[in-house]
């Protein structure tokens, strides 16, 4: 049975590749119209939009460079909001720089903060007025496993700082917007290195977590599918860790 979507419309940022691509297709299978953004010069959105269209729902792709000047990003997002009545935001954009802090630069800092935190703020700001007007909205942001408790990750000082900011932002958004029928959540994927791997394939492999297998895009997509349901209206401000029970500090390999 498909979750109740009632022809709702989702916008998945970064939907051309990686985990956001899988989430986009999963939402389409649930009956959502799914529109995506993609980075100019990056992965072509065609593969994703074709997969969405195959599910019999509406789709479109929009070029948005979330690392561009804030005014340019705002204009691009406002244009999307004018054209599409978005009920569900899945903000999948979130670049990562793996580098010990002693080697990190201000350019790395800008990329992490702008690409992860500022991008989330701008996406929410563009879509919030429409959600308020329709008295319904679901916003999903992404942290990393442990970002809700500021768990350290060697080589990811700037990334973890930005993701912890995303958690604080989403929780505050949930507090302020709940009265308008808008919920906000953070999904924290664990160490998912092969973004195209299926769950059945992952079960044949091992990993150092409580479950004993690697995570997959399907695990993350199922979490998102649950949180954006019509009848998930009593859940908000949730930080859902999809990491196979992994606890403790990361030892990220870095140059």
What are the residue ranges of the model-derived segments?
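Canonical Rossmann dinucleotide-binding motif of NAD(H)/NADP(H)-dependent dehydrogenases/reductases
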Residues: 2-35
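Short, small/polar-rich loop/turn modules that mediate ligand/substrate recognition or access, typified
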Residues: 178, 183, 235-237
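Short C-terminal tail/terminal secondary-structure segment
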Residues: 203, 225, 236-255
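Substrate-binding pocket helix/loop in short-chain dehydrogenase/reductase
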Residues: 97-101, 108-113, 205
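A short, exposed helix-loop element centered on a Lys and neighboring polar residues
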Residues: 124-125, 171
């Amino acid at each position: 049975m498909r979750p109740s979507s009632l022809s709702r419309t989702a916008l998945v940022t970064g939907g051309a590749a990686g985990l956001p691509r899988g989430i986009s297709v999963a939402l389409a299978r649930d009956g959502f119209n799914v529109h995506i953004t993609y980075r100019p010069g990056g992965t072509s959105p065609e593969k994703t939009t074709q997969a969405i269209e195959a599910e019999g729902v509406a789709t479109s792709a929009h070029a948005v460079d979330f690392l561009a000047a804030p005014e340019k990003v705002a204009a691009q997002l406002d244009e999307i909001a004018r054209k599409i009545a978005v009920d569900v935001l899945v903000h999948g954009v979130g670049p990562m720089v793996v580098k010990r802090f002693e080697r990190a630069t201000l350019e790395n800092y800008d990329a992490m903060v702008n690409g992860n935190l500022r991008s989330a703020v701008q996406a929410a700001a563009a879509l919030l007025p429409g959600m308020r007007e329709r008295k319904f909205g679901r916003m999903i942001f992404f942290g990393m496993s442990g970002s809700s408790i500021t768990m350290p990750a060697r080589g990811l000082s700037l990334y973890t700082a930005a993701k912890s900011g995303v958690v604080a932002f989403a929780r505050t958004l949930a507090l302020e917007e709940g009265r308008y029928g808008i919920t906000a959540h953070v999904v924290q994927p664990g160490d998912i290195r092969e973004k195209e791997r299926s769950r059945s394939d992952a079960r044949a492999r091992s990993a150092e977590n409580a479950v004993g297998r690697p995570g997959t895009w399907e695990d993350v997509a199922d979490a998102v599918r649950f949180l954006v349901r019509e009848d998930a209206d009593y859940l908000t401000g949730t930080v859902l860790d999809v990491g196979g029970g992994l606890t403790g500090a990361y030892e990220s390999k870095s140059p």
